[in-house]
Amino acid sequence: MNAFTQIDELVMPLPLEPQGYTIAPSKQSPRLLELTFARETVEAFVQAVAQWPVQALEYKSFLRFRVGEILDELCQGTLRPVLLNTILDRATGGMLITPIGLDDVSQAEDMVKFTTACAHLIGRSNYDAMSGQFYARFVVVNSDNSDSYLRQPHRVMELHNDGTFVNQITDYVLMLKIDEKNMEGGNSLLLHLDDWEQCEAFFRHPLARREMRWTAPPSKKVAEDVFHSVFDTDAEGRPTMRYIDQFVQPENYEEGIWLNALSESLEGSGKKVSVPVGVGSFLLINNLFWLHGRDRFTPHEGLRRELMRQRGYVAFPKPLYQRGQ
């Protein structure tokens, strides 16, 4: 079966076959597609963008699109249509991407360039206040005293959407694993809204569209609260979410009880998908109908995982996609 048959709603013509990479449904879920880039493609990309350090991409934002163009050219123009169609397709909307040969922390700069190329073939990554850049790198170790669950290794980080506490459209999230040592557990956890057993009940609840207050801890470096509902709709009236349990501030008993029930329903879903992500690989998902989290790690004094994230908006005809944000 051609994996392209998974994509139900085309926004631009698909190539007959991918060039320079393969595409197939993942073992974990037919909604999550695996793109694997050939070593030759990756090496050619690394060589072609060697003239620009990551700092150049930080300072000159148009270069982020240029490295995307280079990667698409190496794939003979077949990559951008696949990325766009997949990220916008309600039936899929998620990818696990592996560039063969980029699998060591010493190649971290090339990993950032490669992920940036993919992200900027579909849109643009937003400013990340935590890092002051269009991406953020952070480390998880065995002990943690931070002010959110992002770096806490020995507990599950609950399912959530990104961008809930900023006034920016967050259509996609990209999560790259740069390095890990002495690591057991810690798989990515995913849930597609259309697979969540109780989605319809919560979506139809009177509180689903009530504007709520969202605030972030100091580490996020976001000073102002934002206000929005937990649920919204896409252009076809299907549910979308902007939700994270840590940062929503219920105004009263009614809201608090409903939010607790919503959290318990998400965490108790039997449709959660556990996805191992190798060093150098990354997830690229639609942030509005996929929720993501992380399973707990097994304690180890030498535990270390370094991650990078990008999150942003899809720069393709918006009326075809998302309204209400």
Swiss-Prot record:
Gene disruption: observed consequences: Deletion mutant shows an increased lag time when grown on either L-lysine or 5-aminovalerate (5AVA).
Question: What is the induction comment?
Answer: Induced when grown on glutarate, and also moderately up-regulated by 5-aminovalerate (5AVA) and L-lysine.
Which cofactors does this protein require? Answer: Fe(2+)
Q: Which residues form the signal peptide?
A: none
Q: Name one Pfam family in it.
A: CsiD
The chemistry this enzyme catalyses reads: glutarate + 2-oxoglutarate + O2 = (S)-2-hydroxyglutarate + succinate + CO2
Q: How is the cofactor bound?
A: Binds 1 Fe(2+) ion per subunit.
Family that this chain belongs to: Belongs to the glutarate hydroxylase family.
Question: Could you tell me what this protein is called?
Answer: Glutarate 2-hydroxylase
